[in-house]
Design a protein with these regions (language model features):
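Helix-breaking motifs and short loop linkers at transmembrane-helix boundaries and internal kinks
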Residues: 42-44, 76, 97-103, 114, ...
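Paired small-residue
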Residues: 87-94, 102-110, 315-320
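Cytoplasmic helix-loop-helix junction between adjacent transmembrane helices
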Residues: 107-148
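Extracellular/periplasmic helix-loop-helix junction of adjacent transmembrane segments
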Residues: 35-64
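Helix-loop-helix hairpin linking two adjacent transmembrane segments in secondary transporters
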Residues: 99, 103, 141-186
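Conserved MFS/SLC helix-loop-helix module at the cytosolic interface between two early adjacent transmembrane helices
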Residues: 63-102
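C-terminal ends and interior cores of transmembrane alpha-helices
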Residues: 86-99, 292-309
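Juxtamembrane intracellular "pre-TM" segments in multi-pass secondary transporters
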Residues: 2-7, 189-221
């Protein structure tokens, strides 16, 4: 058994490294968002086809966590993360050589499977080294660091697109993956306690998942964070086409618009890191779920009005999107911390199940937005409004009564 004196601690340097591993989601998604319309033309695909490259990544990212979580509980966090990063580098290079929309969809599927290992096990490593409110604080700080990625990724992607073309974006992702792999190999410790190692046996894995499914409060936290994530994925799927094609924003400038939204998310992360240890993750979560339940439906109604009567401008929507996206930083880390506190002996499995639900629902909402896109903002705002309302319902029905 590892003694307390020899166990790794959650140092600022380790937290930054874990934030880098968590950043592969926004990097893999947000950096190529400005290029979606260009990719559609270059690969002779429709808007719906190219938006499937986003949904394919998210579906694979979610499903892959079913395997990474239990594998991390059996073999340890470090080796599983290293293998995932190595595969990510290879698949990113493959995306750069895609010749058809179908090829890119398939490669993004594999890229999503590779990327999810670091993300799900980075959360698990925080849980290995911190408890409840401190874990919520650490996850918020990690999310604040990670939020730099979605703030800069569209800006960088837009510039790469302008000067080098969209394929260079995936070469840059491959380079980032290689740097992360090298850093993880040199600096990432193993945090799984020997006594918490779980057998990688199908019956045992199913038994652990069954235990989680039967816990009403756990499922409540999982659905609460998942519907919040679905609102974000609806925004990510629809905003490039809405802002660039409908509102005439240049692809290079799209990153500025998206970065403005991420500022709200960063502020939310910093506030949560400051106040979670003071008020508790559960109390903050109880109030935070009301924000998307109010702003989401308002944006939905505004979207219907614009679709029927003509454009009303983008600013009324920004006033709704900003607060809704900011609360992702409050709802996500606090839901995760509250859900994982009861399961230190299978934190990887619990984290993976929440990840599957988050990215599964997110991919479903994003795919619907892509397939129903009609040139207006209404499909995107409708999805965000429904997800925001269901976020509140999940918390009130499952968590409060669980």
């Amino acid at each position: 058994m590892t003694s307390p004196s020899t166990r790794p601690t959650l140092t600022p340097a380790l937290l930054v490294l874990l934030a880098l591993l968590s950043a592969f989601t926004p990097l893999s998604i947000d950096m190529y968002l400005p290029a979606l319309p260009v990719i559609a033309v270059d690969l002779h695909g429709t808007a719906g086809d190219i938006q499937l490259t986003l949904s394919a990544f998210m579906i694979a990212f979610g499903v892959g966590q079913i395997f990474y979580g239990p594998a991390g509980d059996r073999f340890g966090r470090r080796p599983v993360i290293l293998i995932g990063l190595a595969i990510y580098v290879v698949t990113s290079i493959g995306c750069a050589f895609a010749l058809e929309a179908g090829h890119l969809i398939g490669l993004r599927l594999l890229q999503g499977l590779a990327a999810c290992g670091g993300v799900v096990l980075a959360r698990t490593m925080v849980r290995d080294l911190a408890e409840k409110d401190q874990a919520a604080r650490a996850m918020s700080l990690m999310m604040a660091c990670t939020s730099i990625a979605p703030m800069l990724a569209p800006l960088i992607g837009g510039q790469i697109l302008w000067f080098l073309g969209w394929r260079a974006i995936f070469w840059v992702l491959a380079l980032i993956g290689f740097v992360a792999l090298a850093l993880a190999y040199v600096r990432l410790p193993e945090t799984l306690r020997p006594e918490y190692r779980q057998p990688l046996v199908l019956s045992a894995i199913l038994r652990r998942f069954g235990e989680l499914f039967r816990h009403r409060a756990f499922m409540g936290y999982a659905f609460t964070s998942s519907f919040m994530f679905a609102a974000l994925l609806s925004f990510l799927s629809g905003s490039p086409f809405v802002f660039i094609e409908r509102y005439g924003i240049a692809p290079r400038a799209y990153g500025l618009v998206f970065g403005g939204m991420v500022v709200f998310m960063t502020v939310g992360s910093l506030l949560n890191a400051k106040f979670a240890p003071v008020f508790g993750a559960g109390k903050i979560l109880r109030y935070a779920v009301w924000v998307p339940a109010i702003t989401g439906p308002i944006a939905m109604v505004l979207g219907w009005i614009e679709a029927r009567y003509g454009t009303i401008g983008i600013w009324p929507f920004f006033l709704c999107f900003g607060p809704q996206i900011a609360t992702i930083s409050l709802i996500g880390p606090n839901s995760m911390a509250m859900a994982l506190q009861r399961y230190p002996h299978m934190a990887g499995t619990a984290s993976s199940l929440m990840g599957v639900m988050q990215f599964g629902l997110g991919a479903a909402f994003g795919a619907v937005v892509g397939q129903t896109f009609d040139g207006t903002i209404a499909p995107m705002t409708t999805a965000m409004g429904i997800a925001g309302a269901l976020c509140l319902v999940s918390h009130r029905v499952l968590v409060r009564r669980g």
